[in-house]
Amino acid sequence: MKEKTTQLYEGAYVFSVTLSEEARRKALEKVTSGIINYGGEILKIHDQGRKKLAYTIRGAREGYYYLIYFSVVPGVIAELWKEYHLNEDLLRFLTLKTDAVKEVLEFASLPE
């Protein structure tokens, strides 16, 4: 039997600022446990904190940003997206294939 190959992904998640710290932790745990339940592995989580949104989403002007690096079989992504759409605490999400886990996030300064 052929072994299924996993792919490395970078997931960006924006949670509602109306969540308490405990509720936000549980919402993040719901996302990570979903990945693990489908046979995935969490490699790195970057907590990017509270940031202003580019535009209003469901009345929110700010959100808590997390960047998660994980590996999973590619066919699982569609199932994860279904779960994400049902998660009311999650304002937005984006999942991209990537080649490497970034240990440190660096951002360029905006020009003056």
Swiss-Prot record:
Q: Which InterPro entries match?
A: Ribosomal_bS6, Ribosomal_bS6_sf, Ribosomal_S6_plastid/chlpt, Transl_elong_EF1B/ribsomal_bS6
Q: Which GO terms describe its molecular function?
A: small ribosomal subunit rRNA binding; structural constituent of ribosome
Q: Which Gene3D superfamilies match?
A: 3.30.70.60
Give GO terms for biological process: translation
Query: Per its UniProt record, what CDD domains does this chain match?
Result: bS6
Which GO cellular component terms are attached?
A: cytoplasm; ribonucleoprotein complex; ribosome
Pfam families linked to this entry: Ribosomal_S6
Keywords linked to the UniProt accession = Ribonucleoprotein, Ribosomal protein, RNA-binding, rRNA-binding
HAMAP family for this protein = Ribosomal_bS6
Q: What does this protein do?
A: Binds together with bS18 to 16S ribosomal RNA.
- What family is it from? Belongs to the bacterial ribosomal protein bS6 family.
State the protein's name.
Answer: Small ribosomal subunit protein bS6
